[in-house]
A protein has these predicted regions:
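Acidic, surface-exposed loops and disordered segments
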Residues: 1-207
Length: 207
């Protein structure tokens, strides 16, 4: 009975068939905007710090996203402050280490890893990265990690580390470059700008 209450009230006030105006949202980025801004960043401003509140806000998206069989088995470690330097030692070599992210989220699984956990992992990482972009931050998703060293660093034997979301404020510009040739999609840097080749829609749709 209450489902269409607002619609009925609208018609009572403005008349049946009156055009309904969509609410105007100021300052809310569209999905396309977030996707375009959500680029892999490898060089970060070292004086721009990520707050604990920002990290919690990023992880909070996982309370709203899909999970295979609704198992919700992923767990998250928020890394900032004194724990950043030792984790950097594990994740990066010089010279990349000194310009790397200033905060991290380590993603774990609380149950044995399987293909559905890996699907959940992809959904989670992309969702958190877009939330970070919404907050004015940038990310690098790092899946090539030494799981044993990370386990030992945080003395956590109960959970298996799967990937790390590296977070900070970009110190480089990254742009998408539409291409037609799929033979070489290697990103490159030119005149201080990092370009990422991307195939066009017609190149990825199967007709």
């Amino acid at each position: 009975m209450a489902d269409n209450y607002l619609e009925k009230r609208y018609e009572e006030v403005f008349g049946a068939g009156a055009a309904k105006k969509s609410p105007v949202r100021h300052g809310t980025p569209s999905l396309n905007t977030l996707l375009v801004k959500n680029r892999t960043v490898r060089h970060y401003k070292q004086d721009a710090h990520v707050t604990a509140e920002q990290l919690r806000s990023i992880v909070e998206v996982n309370t709203r996203i899909a999970s295979a069989m609704n198992r919700q088995a992923l767990r998250y470690r928020l890394v900032s402050g004194d724990d950043v330097a030792p984790l950097r030692e594990i994740l990066f070599r010089e010279p990349a280490r000194s310009g790397s992210a200033t905060a991290f989220i380590v993603v774990y699984t609380a149950i044995p890893e399987d293909r559905y956990i890996d699907i959940d992992l992809g959904i989670s990482l992309q969702s958190m990265a877009m939330k970070a972009v919404e907050l004015g931050l940038n990310c690098l998703i790092k899946g090539n990690i030494d799981r044993e060293l990370i386990r030992n660093l945080f003395k956590d034997e109960a959970n298996e580390p799967l990937a790390v979301l590296c977070i900070g404020k970009a110190a480089e510009s990254v742009f998408l470059k539409p291409v037609e040739d799929s033979s070489d999609l290697t990103p490159y840097t030119k005149d201080g700008v990092h370009y990422v080749p991307k195939l066009r829609l017609d190149d990825i749709v199967i007709f």
